[in-house]
Amino acid sequence: MAQEFTFTVNGVERTTTENKPLLRYLRDDLNIHSAKDGCSEGACGTCTIHVDGAAVKACVLTTALAAGRNIVTVEGLPEDVREAFVYAFGAVGAVQCGFCIPGMVMAGAALIAEDPEPTEEQIKYAIRGNVCRCTGYKKIIEGISLAAAVLRGEKQIDEDLERGDDYGVGKRAFRIDVRKKVLGEGKYPDDIDELDQPGLTYASAVRSKYPRARVLSIDTSKAEALPGVVGILRAEDVPVNQVGHLIQDWDVMIAQGDITRCVGDAIVLVVAEDEATLEKAKKLVKIDYEPLEPVRNIVEARAEDAPRLHDSFFAFGNTVELKDNVCQSRHVTRGDAAKALAESAFTVTQRFTTPFTEHAFLEPECAVAFPYKNGVKVQSTDQGAYDTRKECAHMFGWDNEPERVVVETMLVGGGFGGKEDVSVQHLAALAAYKLQRPVKCKLTRAESLAFHPKRHAMDGTFTLGCDAEGNFTGLDCEINFDTGAYASLCGPVLERACTHAVGPYKYQNTDIRGFGYYTNNPPAGAFRGFGVCQSEFALESLIDLLAEKVGLDSWEIRYRNAIEPGEVLPNGQIADCSTALKETLLEVKDAYYAHPGHAGIACAMKNAGVGVGLPDAGRCKIRIEDGRAVVYAATSDIGQGCNTVFLQDVAEACGLPLSCIANGECSTENAPDSGTTSGSRQTVVTGEAVRGAAFLLRDAMFGIEAGKPAPAAPVSAHGDGAKIEYDDGRAYQLRSQELIAGQGMHPQDPAAAIKALEGCEFSYVYLEPTDKLGADVPNPKSHICYGFATHVVILDDNGRVSEVYAAHDSGKVVNPISIQGQIEGGVLMGMGYALTEDWPLKDCVPQARYGTLGLFRAPEIPDIHAIYVEKDELLPVAYGGKGIGEIATIPTAPAVQNAYRAFDGKLRPDLPMVDTPYSRARHRG
């Protein structure tokens, strides 16, 4: 007789005869999804639950060990505790992507039950085993403290805050997704189960063990004979076997006889009725390889006798033949850098290297696909629904009918650029269409670490010059990126690294050469900062070296060269009226000078929007459904809060309370394409489209109050940031003050007016032109706008980071609750990049696990001061917002480097830095 294991889950006695991880029992048998599967190795804490009142990670506890225990998940917490955490986390801005949040709640609730008045240090210790990649922990610590105060009766829940009657731009907006994320009720793709999709099957790829090897034979016969196996797909089952975001060079599966390009290349896709059978079947697949010598790095890739990874690739409708391992190159010039540097009073030259780094988002990649109409529907976690549709349709050979693939973006548990490429979406779609069954395909944490694109490793040499007074004269540099086995977004990332290598300063002579090389390392692509973290680390470190030669301090040389409105950036673009770099420098001036020998400083700029002449439209449709304005824009909220921003835009334009506004499904079937969540673009680009649609709605509401009928047909218009037209060619008139938050005109009774517009639709497209890279115009407009920042890092007497002052010009602050957490999270990510994070490779094979990536934990965080600057004169689009997502990370690493140089006189040009207290701790770990 099988042994039985009995325990209590949320007050209900449960018995099972199967000994397996408790996390799997909770999720698979009981359909309790608040406990998340972030790593299944006890490293991340997303599965934290209570066992006899103590916070425990469910992935390391088995059902046998749980016997006789009392188990509680978020669903089983007392209602007053649940409500306290919903309010507290929403009020302080503790929720971003949300994947870590139920685990944080459980860790915090266990602490409060033990000590109702915990200190900050106690809270940090209680969540030491829980990773948050978004917030930098500070807001979570504040949230747990506030929840404790609410439960003690010292603080009251402000119900008005969540209700959102005053939800406009610049107001403290309770994020729209807080409640469902805190309580674990929101659905990420892995939370879709057999109750949602009857007959759900499970798919996973058998992946290459070698970075470069010829696949001699593939034998799937034993796996196919295993009961419960639904099907096994190979390269010959793929209509078009190469996909890619921009360049189609990424094999869906490696065919027999072909050569693998990196560890993790898919060779066969196994589909089974359940996950246990799936794992058994994968082990029965036999693949014979002929291992080949890999191309390990840039030096080997450049060698004359290096094996060529790709003979050609397909991009933008053309086949490109390759002569070597250069995937992409860029050359950005202005003025005469060689002459300027030769005539400079001072110059400095230095080589810098930065490593591959891992996004470490908490949610591993997952997608569910099922047959739908004459094609397939994919429910996924990614950063761009239409991009995923395009890649999947290309794989099927449906480039001319991409609508046969419908993509719905579910909740996304963090991205930071790492979910721009397809990972499992196309595999799930292929299996669902071929086998005519619903299919879930997800990556294990180990597969995710090995497979998805990383931040590019850089090897670059930079030369910067100035005159005798410290005014910059010119920059020359060569930037070399290791893009790994596939292009991913090598071209655009390399381009941003080159165009931003000049920094936010006022000089005009630059010569910047960039190269991205194919190697047999796992691919590199987009990562928060999009190439700028690498080049700005080099430039800002050089500036301190140059300042020393001139005899200026680090703050003064930056202030002397800082760009101001009306001045010309090194790329030729004229700085717009909202530019506030000098203001950010002034905000941190006192902190810098108060800590001589312990302070480092760095500045940065970062574009908003794709720019450089590429079409980058924001699109929005507002439809009135059940008396509410439902906002449809196929944009992915990966934690940055754009879905809340869009509702704030509507509230600001129309005067509506939150109860009359909602987000629609983010689906290619129902929502217009508003581009990828990348390039800090959503607040500006889609935000302006939402505002435009909201103005059309507001006009119709005015009409209702004036006794006019509701529009009989959809109302649509478009604008370019300077003028607006209805789609029938009529000009749209708008008073200039209405572009400023707080100065618009609203209907007298917005809630009543909107009810009379039931079923009406209002659409807007925003497309502001920019100039191509290298455009032959005196002052090319490369991007819609730029954000600016200055960070100061303070070291204590032991050389540890004690404080960070992060001053940001992000234009109009749309949601004050959200911006601080965005800045704090970006700063901590930048600190990790500088000091602790690494993703080591040995002969192209990844060596790290999630727990060894060097991520900062809560007890290690410094005091981060998030400062934002708002000028009186702002851009006219999107109420003046410019985005904060990427720039918060960029200046931190060079500020850390400059702090250490001030501290001990040593230059540390290679990341992660060595010879710091953090590097010693990392080596001990």
Question: Regions from the language model: what does each represent?
Answer:
Residues M1-E162, V612:
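Signature of N-terminal electron-transfer/Fe-S-associated modules in redox systems
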Residues I49, K180, G186, C366-P371, ...:
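Short beta-strand elements
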Residues V86, G108-I112, Y137-K138, S145-L146, ...:
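Short acidic, glycine/serine/threonine-rich loops at helix termini
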Residues G93, K171, D177-L183, E321-A367, ...:
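Glycine-rich loop/linker segments at domain edges
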Residues A149-L322:
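Flexible, low-hydrophobicity surface segments
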Residues A235-E236, W398-R404, Y433-V439, A468, ...:
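C-terminal catalytic domains of large/alpha subunits in multi-subunit enzymes
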Residues P307-F396, N561-R628, Q648, D771-P780, ...:
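Helix-loop-helix junctions that connect adjacent transmembrane helices in secondary transporters/permeases
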Residues L411, G415-Q436, K440-K442, V645-D649, ...:
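Thiamine diphosphate
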